[in-house]
Curated annotation (Swiss-Prot):
Span of the signal peptide: 1-21
Primary site of residence: secreted
Protein name per its UniProtKB record: Protein Turandot C
InterPro entries documented for this protein: Turandot
UniProt keyword RNA-binding, yes or no: no
GO biological process: cellular response to heat; cellular response to UV; innate immune response; response to bacterium; response to heat; response to oxidative stress; response to UV
Keywords, alphabetical: Immunity, Innate immunity, Secreted, Signal
Organism of origin: Drosophila sechellia
Localization terms from the record: Secreted
Pfam families (UniProt xref): Turandot (PF07240)
Family the entry assigns: Belongs to the Turandot family.
Length: 129
């Protein structure tokens, strides 16, 4: 009895990583969502407000990317986001855009829109190949 429970636990440990991956359905859904965000974000405010959603899509996609693609996009993200700290320690995956919900000067607004377009374009290229 004890051996069968141990064997079952071992089998679950071997199978569990395959259940945590980024499925083709999720990838297709995120691809369509990125395209929708880019097409429907016509004004500056909507671009700035939807940047966080693009960041969330990148977080889901990141483990399935090549190290080069991930690093390239993460460099850009680090320039334009603030790290979320909990008790002075960065939270796991904790970054938020610097621009959402703030009154921005024209220069900062231009940076925020440029970041939205850069991130959206990078994600779109990753999905379309």
């Amino acid at each position: 009895m004890n051996a069968s429970i141990s064997l079952l636990c071992f089998a679950l440990l071997l199978i569990s990583p395959f259940c945590l991956g980024y499925s083709d359905e999720e990838r297709e859904s995120d691809s369509l969502r990125v395209a929708e965000i880019l097409q429907t974000s016509k004004d500056d405010e909507s671009k700035i407000n939807r940047t966080q959603e693009l960041l969330d899509i990148f977080r889901r996609l990141a483990p399935s990317l090549s190290p080069e693609d991930r690093e390239r996009i993460e460099r850009s993200i680090k320039e334009h986001t603030d790290e979320i700290l909990i008790d002075g320690v960065p939270s796991q995956g904790g970054r938020k855009t610097k621009y959402v919900g703030k009154i921005l000067s024209p220069v900062a607004q231009g940076l925020a829109i440029g970041f939205f377009e850069e991130l959206g374009g990078s994600l779109s290229r990753l999905f379309t190949g």
